[in-house]
Each structure stands twice: as C-alpha cells, then as structure tokens.
Amino acid sequence: MQMERTFIFRGNASGVAAHIRRPDDEVVPVQAASSLPVIGGLSESTAEGKKFKYLSFESAFTRAHGDFDDAQKAIDITWKKRASDSVPTTTTVISEVKGFTLLSSVRVELIRAEMVARSGKRGKQTSIRPRGSAIQGLTIEGAELVVTLNDEFFCKYDTKEKLDKAMDSGQRSAARLAAAKS
C-alpha cells in the first residue's frame, strides 16, 4: 500500500529562555512558547514580566500560525479531491520581548523576530524570510547602540540551498548579518 503524501506544518517560537552556566547554574524556563501541531493552526502565548537572578523582562509574546493559502482547496483536501501537498502553505512565527535586561549592564527595549515560510513546489525547498524583525533601544553600560539587521541578505537567500551557495562563495554581505553603531 502506498502512503499518501501530506504536508506537515512546523513552526515554533520562544519568548525568553536561558541556561546560565557561570558563575552559577541557573535555568530560565521558556517564557511565552508557541508551537504548531502538524496539522497547522494557531498557537499564541504571552508572559508577563519576570525577574530572575541574571535577567528580567517586562513582557513576552509569541505566535505560530500555519495554514493552506487557498481555503477552498484546503476543504477539497478534506474531501480527498486533491492531495494535501498540492496546496501552497504559509507558516509565520513571531517572538516579541519588551524590556529585556541582562544583569544591570544590558537593556533592550524591544526584541522582535518574525519569520515567514512558504512551502515550495514538489521537489523545491521552502522559502523562509524575515519580516519586521528589530532590535530597538539597546544600551550596554549606558551606551546606546542602533542595530540594523541585514534582512535583505536573508530575503535574497531564502532557502537553505541559496544560503549555502552564498556562504560557500564568500558573499561579502553574508559576513554582515547585523550592523550596530553608537
């Protein structure tokens, strides 16, 4: 009996987590975790601020969402009118942390990461691109740094195959994943 191909959704997001090993061993359990089931759907989580021995945060939010791009074709899958891997999918994950402090020397007002994955056609790799990611209000020992993320690089090289080729060919922009200035 031949198994029917099916699309498996995967999307996970974590807010704040850590395992500090020195000078003391401290595990910070994941705060605000979202994980999609293999059927897709929506997972959201929020965490109100907490203070741990070495770090603290004011709030954390995560979201993982995955679905077929065409609702009618998704219904057709349930009636076995089409194969589940014949309908394009989009998976989006977001993690947003506000008011993050490490010891008393590093402070970040906003850390936001968003990734969007679009399923590839049969035999093609999935495209994964950043969208709306940011690091804002970063201060280290009182010195403010402005961080500019190199999203353009990851949008251009949005599959593992493209990224491997860029890294192997020594793309100059690959070495600059982010820039900071004070």
Regions from the PLM with identified roles:
Residues 1-182:
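Extended, solvent-exposed, non-transmembrane regions
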